[in-house]
Every structure is written in C-alpha cells, then in structure tokens.
C-alpha cells in the first residue's frame, strides 16, 4: 500500500476546495449609471399614485462609459425627477378637466331630455285618444251598416203604417163601446191612459181626431 504524505493531502484539498479556482469564480462587473437610473425610474413608476406613461430619460448611452457623461457626479434623481413630476401633474390635470367637461355637458343636457320626454308622452296620449275616437266611430258605422243590411226601410215604413191604422181603429172601437155603456170618454183620455205616442198615431189634440182619417 502506498502512503500519502501530508504535503500531497494538502495539495489535493487546496485543488478541491480553493475558492480562487477559475472554474468556480465569476468576475463581478460594476453596475453602470444608466442601469441604476433605469431601475430607479422603474421602481418609482410602480409606486406612483397614478399610473402614467413616462418616458425614461437616459443621459448617457449604454455603449459609453461612465467617464464620458458630463453630469456623472450629480445625483441621478436631480435631473429627471422634476420633468417626470411635471408630466404626471399635466396628465392628471388634463384627465380631471375632461371628466369635468363631460359631467357639465351631461348635466346641462338632462333638463332638455326631460322636457322632450314629457312632450313625447303628451303627444302619445293625444294620439291614443284620437285613435280611440276613430275606432268608436268606425264601430258605430259598422253597426248602422249591419242594421240597414238586415232591415229594409221600406218594409219598416209599411209596418209602422199598419200599426198606426190598427191602433186608430182600436181606439175608435174602444171609445164607441164605452159610450154605449154610458161612459163618455174622449180619444185624448184613452191615449193618455194607455201611454201612447200622439205623434206616431198622428193625433191632433185640438180637433180630437186623427189626421189620417
């Protein structure tokens, strides 16, 4: 069996656990001012009270070193913060003005709309009333037409004349019968007692006789 010396063991440990080996270490690169500015502006946009679109202002291009920037010694927020705040205030102010204008215009037009709505309701009521009147008139005309179709006016006139003559004869006979019984009764008294219409009977009260006779 081969024996290992203390120097060889320490050599193996140094090769396995040494932090200075080129495989385990990655050289750290310093963060540029441009990248820091981007991170700061991005963080401020997330924490802002209003979400507004901001344009990131970069003082130095990414391909240039920090020594080429003229304002590298100044704090990064002094150059861009006033502009960003101004843009945000301007955008919020314009939004408030637009909302105020739209609200004012809607409130101004609401009385006009209400007036137009009332006028339309009144016109609707008038049209419905006229429509009902026309429908009622049409219904009456249809009834008259139906009545005339079922009843012949000439036939009705002949029936009325027959009724008048028969009524007159009946009254004459009744008056003669009552006189025979020593009851003197006039035709006017008989017509009134039976509730007959003098105009239909063609009775003349002055002469106390029928006009057709």
Swiss-Prot record:
InterPro entries hit by this protein: SFR1, SFR1/Mei5
GO MF annotation list: transcription coactivator activity
Residue ranges of the region described as Disordered: 1-40, 59-82
Coiled coil residues, start to end: 112-169
UniProt GO cellular component terms: nucleus; Swi5-Sfr1 complex
Localization: Nucleus
Main location: nucleus
Protein name in UniProt: Swi5-dependent recombination DNA repair protein 1 homolog
Species of provenance: Xenopus laevis (African clawed frog)
